[in-house]
């Protein structure tokens, strides 16, 4: 069942989203060669709690850490540990925050130091795809319009969409209806209506789209070892257009659409 929210609830989700954005920027500022992903997770946990929030991922279906940190060929759900971040890596910070009963979710892939041109293009295309998806998140459109817009940008650039992973409703719960795939036909799927809040999140690879699940039951990586990127915003569907509830702070963003 799709849960539609009123203005006050959307504002609460937006406040949670503001803390999500601040957390991503705060953790991003600590990413450097030599730091461990567990150290970054601790930074995130302490930052969120110091501002009255709770890391939504921690304990969710047994997940053991505060946030997800996915490096290089890991697409999503990387569990922070003692692994050391290296220069030239791609590091995705995926943060969910619960604040005053509202939940927001966002992700951002950082480059660690200097990366090659093709890796940078992967990041740029993923952000472009997110922007294209958000632009279609308007009253009267359908989920398929978002999905198709993302797919066109990604595949048009020669990259692959991970079809087994997708966005979702969010707000009262971490994962709500509807599913928001990153591929599909325009004009198909549930119609977008006022008060829907959804996480739009292209997850793309430089190589093939297939992925595999690690023995830890969480980490999902590319089957061919190719690099992956993941950008995500929580978005509200409103009469004036899509409202990004997790607007970026302190990091470059190509996906500003609608009301910040």
Regions found by a protein language model. Give the residues of each.
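Active-site neighborhoods and metal-handling regions in enzymes and metal-associated proteins
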Residues: 1-260
């Amino acid at each position: 069942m799709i849960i539609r929210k009123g203005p006050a609830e959307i504002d609460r989700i937006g406040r949670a989203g503001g803390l999500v954005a601040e957390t991503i920027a705060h953790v991003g500022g600590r990413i450097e060669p030599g730091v461990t992903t567990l150290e970054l997770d601790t930074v995130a946990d302490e930052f969120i709690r110091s501002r009255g929030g709770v890391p939504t991922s921690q304990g969710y279906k047994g997940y053991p850490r505060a946030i997800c940190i996915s490096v290089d060929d890991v697409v999503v759900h990387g569990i922070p540990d003692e692994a050391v971040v290296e220069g030239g890596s791609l590091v995705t910070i995926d943060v969910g925050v619960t604040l005053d009963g509202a939940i927001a979710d966002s992700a951002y892939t950082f480059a660690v130091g200097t990366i090659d041109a093709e890796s940078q293009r992967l990041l740029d295309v993923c952000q472009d795809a997110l922007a294209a998806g958000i632009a279609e998140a308007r009253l009267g459109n359908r989920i398929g319009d978002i999905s198709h817009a993302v797919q066109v940008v990604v595949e048009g650039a020669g990259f692959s969409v991970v079809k087994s992973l997708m966005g979702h409703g969010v707000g009262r719960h971490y994962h709500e209806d509807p599913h928001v795939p990153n591929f599909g036909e325009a004009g198909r799927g549930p119609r977008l209506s006022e008060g829907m809040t959804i996480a739009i999140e292209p997850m793309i690879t430089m190589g093939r789209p297939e992925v595999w699940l690690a023995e830890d039951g969480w980490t999902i990586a590319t089957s061919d070892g190719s690099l992956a990127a993941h950008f995500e915003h929580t978005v509200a569907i409103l009469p004036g257009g899509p409202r990004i509830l997790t607007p970026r702070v302190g990091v470059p963003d190509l996906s500003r659409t609608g009301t910040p």
